[in-house]
From Swiss-Prot:
Binding site for a plastoquinone: 214, 261
Main enzyme class: oxidoreductase
Protein name, per record: Photosystem II D2 protein 2
Binding sites annotated in the UniProt record for pheophytin a: 129, 142
Source species of the chain: Synechococcus sp. (strain ATCC 27144 / PCC 6301 / SAUG 1402/1) (Anacystis nidulans)
Amino acid sequence: MTIAVGRAPAERGWFDVLDDWLKRDRYVFVGWSGLLLFPCAYLALGGWLTGTSFVTSWYTHGIASSYLEGGNFLTVAVSTPADAFGHSLMLLWGPEAQGNFVRWCQLGGLWNFVALHGAFGLIGFMLRQFEIARLVGVRPYNAIAFSGPIAVFVSVFLMYPLGQSSWFFAPSFGVAAIFRFLLFLQGFHNWTLNPFHMMGVAGILGGALLCAIHGATVENTLFEDSEQSNTFRAFEPTQAEETYSMVTANRFWSQIFGIAFSNKRWLHFFMLFVPVTGLWMSSIGIVGLALNLRAYDFVSQELRAAEDPEFETFYTKNILLNEGIRAWMAPQDQPHEKFVFPEEVLPRGNAL
């Protein structure tokens, strides 16, 4: 007599069916992260294209900011709401627009729409990298690296204005608008002298340098494994052997610097660590600016420059430049304040 012992098949619920459908092998992977990524990315991009095409900033900044008004790709923007609205979410059905779409656009509601959907879209993209890494069976360092751009976006577009009086002081979504924001950060926060900005610059430029050095070194040490003039055709994605000589690369840089990477894993981790850490440091610095924290103030140089007309340093010159940015930028940047500065209070260099 034969006795078959088995387990009854577990019932598949709606969650299992949905999980199978989301993770099905298709040209563009969806996944659970796609439920957040695709709608948010679509709405953020659509809101930006709509705003830059048709929506004016006359009611919020007193400027033209759309293609419809004569702007071009470098000058159009989705502008921040007016200063008077504070940190309102600017919902379409909220007390500001009261369900009127045209009024909502005029008051700057599209900026909140693009900023919030953009932030969640970026988070969805990072979760997508986590999800695919788990399914493929690789480590999640791509997702961890992408936390750097997310930190910068959230700190600049959300944390900074939350620390200030309103969304008005966040950057608008446009090329020239971002440049204006950079000048604003310099004039009102002396951002370039901030150590976190310095670490950010070192990280980004250092990452670019490492990338250039690594790419050039690999190209220099490719194995001569083809008779063709084009070395790229000699590579096969599934080949088992190395395509370049790490030993030769190590000898080359050892002769130049006296020191070189001998471990590929450490080398590539360093290429990940430098730029991502720079982005994180910049984000921390922006949060500090949101709280109006000061960085370096060399008061002794300022006092001596005030007492001695012949004493001047690059620091004191930059302080004067910052005063100039504030004095001349504020009336243009914040027309609602109706600033009027008489000529005698505008900054002048010691030599004038």
